[in-house]
A protein has these predicted regions:
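Conserved ABC ATPase signature
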Residues: 58-62, 66
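Conserved ABC ATPase "signature" region
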Residues: 35-53
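Catalytic Walker B motif of ABC-type/P-loop ATPase nucleotide-binding domains
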Residues: 83-86
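Conserved catalytic motifs of ABC-family nucleotide-binding domains
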Residues: 79
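A short, surface-exposed alpha-helical micro-motif characterized by mixed small hydrophobic
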Residues: 125-127
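H-loop/switch region of ABC-family ATPase nucleotide-binding domains
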Residues: 119-120
Length: 174
C-alpha cells in the first residue's frame, strides 16, 4: 500500500459500527487473512494508544482525541509507505497533542515510513519535522530544515504563519 491519508476531521473517515471494524476496514478491503487483519488492528491500536477495551464501542461516541487516534490507526493498519496527516493535532489539548506526536514518531521510527504532516502549528512542525516545505497560494516558498526555515521569521509572518515560541524567544533575546 503506497499512500495513506488521514483527514483533518476524523468524523469524515469513521463510519463502521465498532472501533475494531473501523480500524479493520482498510486491511479487510486489501483481502488479507483474518489473522493478518487482527494482527494489524492490534498493532495499529498499539501505535496510536487505543485501548482494546474500546474495540466494541462505536467510534462516533468517543472523544475527539480518541476519534483522531482511531482514524490514524485505520490508515496505519494498511501500512502505507507514505502517511499523510492533515492537522493531526488540531483541537486537542496539550497532552493529546504530545501523545499523537510521540505515536507518529514511534511509527516512523519502527516502520521507516515517510510521514507528511500538514499543519499551521509551527511549534508542532519545529518539534517533529526533519524537512519543511512552506506553501503560499499553492507555491513552495521555503524548503529546508527547521533551522533554515525558522531563521526567516519575517517571511513566515508575512504569509500568515507564526514562528515557534522558541524562535520568538531567541529573537527577543538578541
Amino acid at each position: 500500500f503506497k499512500v495513506g491519508l488521514v483527514f483533518q476531521y476524523p468524523e469524515y473517515q469513521l463510519f463502521e459500527e465498532t472501533v475494531y471494524k473501523d480500524i479493520a476496514f482498510g486491511p479487510t478491503n486489501m483481502k488479507l487473512s483474518e489473522e493478518e487483519i487482527d494482527s494489524r488492528v492490534r498493532e495499529a491500536a498499539g501505535f496510536t494508544g487505543i485501548d482494546e477495551e474500546l474495540f466494541e464501542r462505536s467510534p462516533l461516541e468517543l472523544s475527539g482525541g480518541q476519534k483522531r487516534r482511531i482514524a490514524i490507526a485505520g490508515v496505519i493498519a494498511m501500512r502505507p509507505e507514505v502517511l499523510v496527516l492533515d492537522e493531526p493535532t488540531a483541537g486537542l489539548d496539550p497532552a493529546g497533542c504530545r501523545q499523537i506526536q510521540e505515536n507518529l514518531c514511534a511509527y516512523r521510527e519502527k516502520t521507516g515510513a515517510t510521514v507528511i504532516i500538514v499543519s499551521h502549528s509551527m511549534d508542532d512542525v519545529a518539534r517533529l519535522a526533519e524537512r519543511i516545505l512552506v506553501f503560499d497560494k499553492g507555491h513552495v516558498v521555503m524548503d529546508g530544515t527547521p533551522e533554515e526555515v525558522f531563521s526567516r521569521p519575517e517571511e513566515l509572518t508575512g504569509i500568515g504563519l507564526d514562528v515557534p515560541h522558541a524562535t520568538e524567544l531567541a529573537m527577543a533575546l538578541r
